[in-house]
Structure formats: structure tokens, C-alpha cells
Amino acid sequence: MEAGEGKEPVPKQRQVLIFFVLLGIAQASCQPRHYSVAEETESGSFVANLLKDLGLEIGELAVRGARVVSKGKKMHLQFDRQTGDLLLNEKLDREELCGPTEPCVLPFQVLLENPLQFFQAELRIRDINDHSPVFLDKEILLKIPESITPGTTFLIERAQDLDVGTNSLQNYTISPNFHFHLNLQDSLDGIILPQLVLNRALDREEQPEIRLTLTALDGGSPPRSGTALVRIEVVDINDNVPEFAKLLYEVQIPEDSPVGSQVAIVSARDLDIGTNGEISYAFSQASEDIRKTFRLSAKSGELLLRQKLDFESIQTYTVNIQATDGGGLSGTCVVFVQVMDLNDNPPELTMSTLINQIPENLQDTLIAVFSVSDPDSGDNGRMVCSIQDDLPFFLKPSVENFYTLVISTALDRETRSEYNITITVTDFGTPRLKTEHNITVLVSDVNDNAPAFTQTSYTLFVRENNSPALHIGSVSATDRDSGTNAQVTYSLLPPQDPHLPLASLVSINADNGHLFALQSLDYEALQAFEFRVGAADRGSPALSSEALVRVLVLDANDNSPFVLYPLQNGSAPCTELVPRAAEPGYLVTKVVAVDGDSGQNAWLSYQLLKATEPGLFGVWAHNGEVRTARLLSERDAAKHRLVVLVKDNGEPPRSATATLHVLLVDGFSQPYLPLPEAAPAQAQADLLTVYLVVALASVSSLFLFSVLLFVAVRLCRRSRAASVGRCSVPEGPFPGHLVDVSGTGTLSQSYQYEVCLTGGSGTNEFKFLKPIIPNFVAQGAERVSEANPSFRKSFEFS
């Protein structure tokens, strides 16, 4: 994109920037302020205080980045932001900077930012009398024929003084003599030319040579002077002066002409003969620059280059050439040499302001201010600036070849953190020359990215009975920012369930996101829980994100089967009555057991471990029902003791035993026959009856209370279903010898017992129903129930 050529419509968002740029241009276009200083003033000397002219207070100078800029790479001035003083950066030599030009003015600008303003000013360098008049030739030779009549004027070599104004050359004097006096003539360009005027005729025989001292004086205070010896040789008569073919020669020569190139050939002729007709050529009134640049052949009049030309330094030369014959007569001509400019200078770029580091997300922000220049002329000095097209920057022309580099669209460090910008300045010469200036802009980070977790949710598995401080898993989040904006800190967020004691369950390492269990977990108390973790960066303001963590507690076989019926609490043993007329398969009783574990650890199997008479009774492995294995006979003992083993399917398996007492009776309507070891007293029979009734009533009441409590707990849990996790239970058919007691044990069936008890005066018969325990429906492969602290040892199974 090229600045200075066709411009696209300015977007609305840049109106503010353009306003300040135009404001700066408007101010820059005002009449410049003038300041002056004498040349050769010491570096650091005070020039002027700019506060009043700038219309600023001292405190605003640093804020607005006030600085002095000027064309070229050399900075002659410096600006003190603390005081507003304009100071010299170095000694200034007026003759070196401006030569004979008067006045000697150095333009400069004061650049202000925020908003951008240019303050135009000029520094005039006053001349001091630091140069004396100097004659380039310390001896001036004049050959004057003795026939010259009085009143004849002779032009002599003038002195040169680099100072200007009153300090320049003002007067000449000649030493006292009888033959000549000095006449001063002003030329058209204001130069004083000394001339010798003959007062009386010369006589070579009387005085063949006259020596005079010519003194040049300047107008300084005190004046300076320079002298030269004027040696006059009186020669014989020569009545024809050399005449040039042209009084003015105009030539053009390219500035890249090689040394030794011919510039021009001048030619003069003399009508005299002999030595009076022999012509020699020499420079007349030639400055030091002319003598350094050109060489003149005394015999041929050929003007040659002595050194390379430079259009940017000197564009024209006026060379005075004098032709002198052997008799001392001379004539002059002028060779006007015009140096032709070539495109031999590439453009120059001077950076005034450069901001190397820019925060991201900024737009229409000033990056750099620079100026361009080309010492060539015409199209060779016209320039255009450009940068790469694929960058979010654009160039804005300002005033007097000043440009600003501005951000066009907001930068994003995460997309690109560094830009290498090449500013190309190209002139319109042939061939086109260009200069490239590279700058690097670093995009600094702004906290515009929140940490992002690698997963939106994490599922962690922990086996119960773990050791405290166990590492159970990790969460991880990354931040696309850099530095402190990318440093992530992890934390636990308050749980949604106010009853979940999260602070006592888990902790998180704030630096790396490692999660630790603070206590030993109990599956039977808490199967699963979930919580949220936060990740926050250290930016300002800090950004954060969160993720869900689900912790599933895996069951361990840490609970042995618990026999609910018959009670094994050490009280009076439970006695089951079986009629001797019972058929094989007759249901004697049912051993009811539960296991606090889940899944395979809660699958229970039953087997008959001991029996008074093996083969008479059997236990169904899958439901714990005790049934008769064959017909009973009179030979079978009336009292039997059975030991039933209840075993789970864990690894290693855990077990419990239940002891049953079975009493064989002939019929429920007949009197009760005491066991052999029982006392025949009627009081003992009555006591046994009371024990049986109390035991059965207690078991029934216990089951009823358990069912009611379980239903209440389930209803309470459903009200908190939003925070309930999921847990898997074994699927597929159970093994044939196992029964699933998850939530129900073996109490899923209702059954009856008929009991015949002998009273004191007759036979009483009654029946009662066992309480029905409802089936607990499995919650699915992913459902996990929350722990209820008040129901830890109750019928809570998954």
C-alpha cells in the first residue's frame, strides 16, 4: 500500500485520529517562529524557551513527548522537556552550513504527540568575524607594457572572505607608490573588485619591476586583514590583446562524469606575432572550489574535470578564464558550467518516534513518526512510501515529507506476537532508487483469554477404604495468554449441594490441579459425589473457567453378610415347629440375610453347614429357604439344630452363620411334647410359649420399622436427585447358587408360618403373616446414591 497516492475512504473509526493529524498539519502550516544564535556558540548553550510559543505547561512536555526534529540525520538542536529550553547540540559553523548564503536559516519542527502536532520554527545563525580575508595567490604578477598610457586600469586578483555581511571583505589598500593607485569597483553581485590605475607612464629602463603590497580588510570589529604581493613587470610594447572567440561559454555536464572528462575548450587569438602573439590560459578570479574541481590546460585552453561532481552540493560553476599573450596583454571569458542531476542518491528515512511494543486489542494507535528526503531534484527527488500489504498497519502522510505509521485493525497476540515491518521509500527517478527501513513491533499480551480445561467434565474412580491424602486424579487447564496472564491457579468451588462436606472430602493443588482424597471413603456411606473446580489466571482482571468433577467410589468387600432372621443376638434361640406329617420340600423357615456391599460383593449364597441329622433338611442356595429333604419318621429325633452358612461372592469372600432350632411335632392340635432335655413342668412350657411369641413379634416389628425407614430415606433422596451421581451395578443373570441382595436381601417374598402351642388347659391355634419387604429397584448402570449420615447401617444398598 502506498501513501501519498490514491486513498480509500477513511473508515469511521479513524475519524478521531484524522482529526488530530489534520489539527497537527493545520498548526504546522502556521507562520514559523524565528530564533537566532551566533555561530560557534558552545554546545549546550541556551537558544530560547519554547513554553510560551508552544502554549504548554512544563508538565505537558513529557506527557506529549515533545521533541525537536529536522531534516537530515544530523541533530543540531536538543530540547529539554524539564524546562522547555531549546539548546544547542553542537557548535554551529555558519560557513559550513550555509556557505555564502545570507541569512543562514535552519528550519526545524517541534513534534508533539497525543494528539499529533507539528510546531514550525527557524533558527537563524548569526555570522561572527571568524575568518580573515585570504588571497588565493600570495603573489600577483602583472606584466605591463611601458607604452601603456596613464589612467589605464588593471584588474587584479581579489581576496576571499568566508564571512558575510559587515564581517565580509569591505576594503582594499595598496602600499604607497608613485605609479599606481587603487580603485575599488562593485560588481553586479556585490563583490568588491580591486583595480590598479596607472598614474604616470612606466619606463622599463628606469624601473623594470615594481613591488606593491595589496591589503584586503573586512568590516569586523576588530577588522581582519590579508595581504598579497603585487609584482609588476614592465615589458616592451605589445599593442594587441588576446581576443576569445566567445565571451560566454555555456556547457552542461552530467554529475557522474569521470575525472579527466573534458568540460569545454576555450580559444583566443592575438594579432601580434612572436612572443607577443603567444597565448597562455589561466584561471581568473577563480574560487577554491573551482580550482579543486577543474583543471585548465595553459596551452590548449582545454577545461578538464579534476574531481567528481555532485549536483547535490553545487549545481553551477562560473569559471573566469584569462588569455595572456607574451607581451602581457590579456583578455577574459566566462565558462558557465551547469551540472546535470542524475538519480544517484537513494531516499533517506529519518525515524523521529518509534514504539516497539504495543498492547494487543488496540486500534488506530500511532506506532512511528518519520520523515523522508532525497537530495536529488525533479522526479529524482520525488518519493513515495509503502509497507507490506498483508500487515494490519497503514501509512498516513503528514506535513513536509513526514509520515505516521498507524495500526489499522486490532492486533491479537495469540495469532501473531511479532511484526517485521519494512518501510520502503522509492523515488521517481530513472532508474528508481529505493531505501528500506525495517522495524520490529512486538505485541504485548493482554489478558483476553480465560483458562480452558482439557475436558468439560472429569470422572474419577476411587476404591473405598483408601488412605488419606491419596492422589485420585488431576484436572488440567491451559491459557493462550503469556506471562502472568497464562499462570493458572486451581481451586474448589462451593458445591451445589449444601449438605456435601466437600472441604473434608477432597483438596486440590492450586499449582498443578492434582486432586487428593482427604479421608478414607466409605462406599456404604457415600457412593458418588460431584463438585466443580475453577481455574483462574493471574491477569488483571483475572479470568476463570470451571469444570465438573465426578468422583465414583468403588465398592470393596468390607462387609460380611448380616443375618436378619433368625436373630443371632444371643437371646433365646428361635425354634421352628415342623409336623412329622410334612411332605418332602416342606418350608420350615427362611434365613434372611443382607450384605452392606454392592454388586458381586453383595451376592449371597446359602448352604447347610451343620445338622443334627444330615439329609433330613436342606437349604436352597439362592434364597435361604430351609425345607425338608424327605419324609419324616418316628425314628427321627424330635429336636434338631441346624447351622446355615451365608457367604458373599467377594474376593476374598466373607461369611456369617445362622443357627436354627427345629422341633418335630406330631400335629399342631396335639399337646406339645417336650424335648428330652426339657423339664416336664407345665411352667416351663408356658415360658417357652412366651419366648416364641415375643421373638416373632420382635422380628415382625423390626422388619416393619426397617421398611418404613427405608421408604422415608428413598423419598428424601429423590428430592435431591439433581446432585445424585451415577454408579454401575453388575448386569446379566446371577449365578444359580447366588441371590442378589442389593436393597432387598432375601425378603422379597411374603410367607406364612403356622404354629401350634400348648397352653395350660387346652390347645390354642393362631396364624400370623410375615411383613412384606418391597423390592428395591436398581437405579441403572450409571446411577449413584448419595450418602445419608443417619442411615449408614440400615438397608441402604445399591
Swiss-Prot record:
For this UniProt entry, the molecular function terms from Gene Ontology, in alphabetical order, are: calcium ion binding
Residues on Extracellular side: 31-692
Cadherin domain residues are 37-135, 136-244, 249-349, 354-453, 458-563, 570-673
Positions in the Cytoplasmic compartment:
714-798
**Residues where N6-acetyllysine occurs?**
K299
Q: What does this protein do?
A: Potential calcium-dependent cell-adhesion protein. May be involved in the establishment and maintenance of specific neuronal connections in the brain.
Q: What is this protein called?
A: Protocadherin beta-2
Organism for this UniProt entry: Pan troglodytes (Chimpanzee)
